[in-house]
Amino acid sequence: MTTPIRFELIKTCRQTGARLGILHTPHGSFETPMFMPVGTLATVKTLSPEELKEMGAGVILSNTYHLWLRPGHDIVAEAGGLHAFMNWDRGILTDSGGFQVFSLSEFRRIEEEGVYFRNHLNGDKLFLSPEKATEIQNALGADIIMAFDECPPYPATYDYMKRSVERTSRWAERCLKAHRRSNEQGLFGIVQGGEYEDLRRQSARDLVSLDFPGYAVGGLSVGEPKDVMNRVLEFTTPLLPTDKPRYLMGVGSPDSLIDGAIRGIDMFDCVLPTRIGRNGTVMTSEGRVVIKNAQYARDFTPLDPNCDCYTCRNYTRAYIRHLIKCDETFGIRLTSYHNVYFLIKLMEQVRQAIREDRLADFREEFFERYGFNKPNAKNF
């Protein structure tokens, strides 16, 4: 299969097995492991494309379900596709909309042909199938598009998960058949199976036989404990081809990025940095800071003294706290900028540690500084 997406493996860390690579796309080549900021509605909330480039973002994520509802994939196509519509000339990945259908809609009915559900905005009845999800993504024009999968809840029974995995495999085949722009867009398959090793094995075998240009590990970061996620990754990533990129969906806390890379993951995405930024929480080299707390009212130091981002070079904790407390948009911009920058730079450090065969040492140092080694450590 000819594909516009190619993965080049540069080096494997001797200490951990983590992979240093390059993801080649129609809109540039980007080093992995990488963190992909999420721009659900064709914008990373409060941040401009120029700012994202300034930070070193390579691929960003947009959401098929939301863009289908607003403004409509036909309008995006008319604009020349997502790249032209949002003025972003680097990589874009769109998810299939499956997760939103399963998480946002209170009413949904899963049939073999697809999913019937209600629009979360106005209650209208809608239907999304593998063919429709692929058609929408073809119109949106991202570099990487995702197969439409069923996203089971956690926990799910073995029998339910087995049926779900089999359906996801059949849907993946239908997505491939419906894909009309395979010379311009790489379609990735999504491995499901919950925490059941034999079902992950079955799902991976089914999808690898279809020869996708890349594979995602789905169904994680849905409420399971971190040790369960790590265990699932340990038995799932070895089932995937070494010459294809591996994408862990919906994961963005610093500890999970490092632990995912150690387990052979190349790509990550999450709304976490902008979502917690809007609530006044920031990630720093010394751990997380809840900037709304009273202790920062007279703190005239940067959010993170070890960070050289725009926010930390120019503004103090006291000022940012004032903005957030007053619901000023600029405060949200400053915390969001810093958090996205923090994760992009963290992945640069991870890549450097892989080059130097010292990722396990880096993990230990980072966890100690950040506070992940403490009892009752916070997730981010």
UniProtKB/Swiss-Prot annotation:
GO terms for cellular component: cytosol. Substrate binds at D95, S96, G97, G98, F99, D149, Q192, G219. GO terms for molecular function: metal ion binding; tRNA-guanosine(34) queuine transglycosylase activity. Pfam families: TGT (PF01702). Its cofactor is Zn(2+). Its EC number is 2.4.2.29. Binds 1 zinc ion per subunit. It catalyses: 7-aminomethyl-7-carbaguanine + guanosine(34) in tRNA = 7-aminomethyl-7-carbaguanosine(34) in tRNA + guanine. Zn(2+) binds at C307, C309, C312, H338. Signal peptide: none annotated. GO terms for biological process: queuosine biosynthetic process; tRNA wobble guanine modification; tRNA-guanine transglycosylation. Pathway: tRNA modification; tRNA-queuosine biosynthesis. Gene3D superfamilies: Queuine tRNA-ribosyltransferase-like (3.20.20.105). Keywords: Glycosyltransferase, Metal-binding, Queuosine biosynthesis, Transferase, tRNA processing, Zinc. InterPro entries: ArchSynthase1/Queuine_TRR (IPR050076), TGT (IPR004803), TGT-like_sf (IPR036511), tRNA_ribo_trans-like (IPR002616). It is an enzyme of class 2 (transferase). HAMAP family: Q_tRNA_Tgt. Belongs to the queuine tRNA-ribosyltransferase family. This is Queuine tRNA-ribosyltransferase. It comes from Geobacillus thermodenitrificans (strain NG80-2). The lineage of its organism: Bacteria, Bacillati, Bacillota, Bacilli, Bacillales.
